[in-house]
Amino acid sequence: MQLNSIKPAPGAKHPKRRVGRGIGSGLGKTAGRGHKGQKSRAGGFHKVGFEGGQMPLQRRLPKRGFVSPTKKNDAEVRLSALDRIPGDIIDILILKQAGLVSGSALNVKVILSGKIERAVKLQGIPVTKGAKAAIEAAGGSVE
């Protein structure tokens, strides 16, 4: 088989539909658009969400809530996730690079969930009491 001899499977390619080319084609006269009406005209499509002049749904429903300007950008990291990060020293930047916390996270806390098998050194990351005990039991430290 050569690259220049590759062809699509039989029936995989359909001929382009040519509309408005006589009644013998099956798609002549109205060209598949039906008779009259807005959708049969050139440029005859309304914008998404338009309901014919009726008050649209997004305007009929009341507003709700607000976006807090002081939203907390906190994240939690499981202890078992630290086991999968290469390297011995872990800080917030390394957690972001590993994809364990979002880039917008300002505060990160390690929680006791799962096990940690190797010694890691946490820098500038708060941990729960149980997580701290587990890290130190594995030979690691928290700064």
From Swiss-Prot:
This protein's record includes keyword Ribosomal protein: yes
Keywords, sorted A to Z: Ribonucleoprotein, Ribosomal protein, RNA-binding, rRNA-binding
Segments of this protein annotated with the region Disordered: 1-54
Biased segments, Gly residues type: 21-31
InterPro entries assigned to the protein according to its UniProt record, in alphabetical order: Ribosomal_uL15, Ribosomal_uL15/eL18, Ribosomal_uL15/eL18_sf, Ribosomal_uL15_bac-type, Ribosomal_uL15_CS
Gene Ontology molecular-function annotations: rRNA binding; structural constituent of ribosome
Cellular component terms (Gene Ontology): cytosolic large ribosomal subunit
GO biological process: translation
PANTHER family: 50S RIBOSOMAL PROTEIN L15, LARGE RIBOSOMAL SUBUNIT PROTEIN UL15M
Assembly, per entry: Part of the 50S ribosomal subunit.
Family recorded in the similarity comment: Belongs to the universal ribosomal protein uL15 family.
Entries under HAMAP family matching the protein: Ribosomal_uL15 (MF_01341)
Function summary: Binds to the 23S rRNA.
Name of the protein this chain belongs to: Large ribosomal subunit protein uL15
